[in-house]
């Protein structure tokens, strides 16, 4: 089980590195430089797609209408992680590219930061410990206790969950952006996904189960 969880967690996959030959000064003019940067961008996108395809292979295939089945938001660590999960960031980038459905050049110009786009709902994300969660709902609908620490050969590691929730401001006052408030009422609601965690059921049985956490 530990091996399986490490595959699903942060920093366990072997991410290929990107190496380029030469630099911009050795290229023959701006056209070659542009082609070099475009090629590097295409290579980077290809690597991301391979990583996400590999992640999908190890995900369960059964769907659930109440929540996404799998999300890479769990990390085993001795201290609070300083950054969001890498696969979470890659998924966000991949979703953006899929939505754009255009060439790399047009995608770069359609960066939301350049167009001043805003999310439909405001949200906040943070790492949460099992001590803060305490309990969760598993795939069978039962409430289980989330264990704070996971035993490893050289000691124990804490379970951390990267949760995303709607901000109280967007939920309570403003509703969803892009909705005509003259005709429609809207509300930002936090949705959940399943992640694998070490838990204990009401019969004191400890095991790895899929539990729900807030993800958007």
Curated annotation (Swiss-Prot):
It holds the Pfam family NGF. SUPFAM superfamilies: Cystine-knot cytokines. Disulfide bonds join 121-188. GO terms for cellular component: axon; dendrite; extracellular space; synaptic vesicle. Its main location: secreted. The keyword Disulfide bond applies. Keywords: Cleavage on pair of basic residues, Disulfide bond, Glycoprotein, Growth factor, Secreted. Residues 1-108 form a propeptide. Glycans are attached at residue 101. InterPro entries: Brain-der_neurotrophic_factor (IPR020430), Cystine-knot_cytokine (IPR029034), Nerve_growth_factor-like (IPR020408), Nerve_growth_factor-rel (IPR002072), Nerve_growth_factor_CS (IPR019846). One of its GO terms (molecular function) is growth factor activity. One of its GO terms (biological process) is nerve development. PROSITE patterns: NGF_1, NGF_2. It is found in: Secreted. PANTHER family: BRAIN-DERIVED NEUROTROPHIC FACTOR, NERVE GROWTH FACTOR NGF -RELATED. Promotes the survival of neuronal populations that are all located either in the central nervous system or directly connected to it. Belongs to the NGF-beta family. This is Neurotrophic factor BDNF precursor form. It comes from Cylindrophis ruffus.
